[in-house]
Amino acid sequence: MLKKKKTEVYALGEHISMSADKARRVIDQIRGRSYEETLMILELMPYRACYPILKLVYSAAANASYNMGSSEANLVISKAEVNGGTTVKKLKPRARGRSFPIKRSTCHITIVMKDISLDDEYVEMYSLKKTRWKKKPTAMPYRDMYNSGGLWDKK
């Protein structure tokens, strides 16, 4: 029986002290991109969520090189998701014996990377893809270009 070689590795970050919506803003920018491109994007973005996501991307790449022996040039982020974690609820004491609730939200981040050199479907898809060097000319007749039936036709 032939054993299929694994093409995906993942890194999981749980209970990261950050809102899931703020982490999703960054995750949406890196989903589907290559490893080098992801590192450039995360290092230049000005959000606090970039640092834990950058650590997870590094960890997933290290898992790929250690477990599968693949190079970092062939890695692509195939799946990246953010789920809400537990919410830590505390009470802040206020004046006159009152208290206000404080909610610290956490999130779970999952980064899945795929090695495109091992994935047959990915290689076939990009080898069969047709490149378009020139745009198709839009043939618009001269009379339609300037005679659109606007205000200039009426007297």
UniProtKB/Swiss-Prot annotation:
The keyword Plastid applies. It is found in: Plastid, Chloroplast. GO terms for molecular function: rRNA binding; structural constituent of ribosome. Keywords: Chloroplast, Plastid, Ribonucleoprotein, Ribosomal protein, RNA-binding, rRNA-binding. GO terms for biological process: translation. PROSITE patterns: RIBOSOMAL_L22 (PS00464). The keyword Chloroplast applies. InterPro entries: Ribosomal_uL22, Ribosomal_uL22_bac/chlpt-type, Ribosomal_uL22_bac/org-type, Ribosomal_uL22_CS, Ribosomal_uL22_sf. Belongs to the universal ribosomal protein uL22 family. NCBIfam families: rplV_bact. Part of the 50S ribosomal subunit. This is Large ribosomal subunit protein uL22c. It comes from Nicotiana tomentosiformis (Tobacco). The lineage of its organism: Eukaryota, Viridiplantae, Streptophyta, Embryophyta, Tracheophyta.
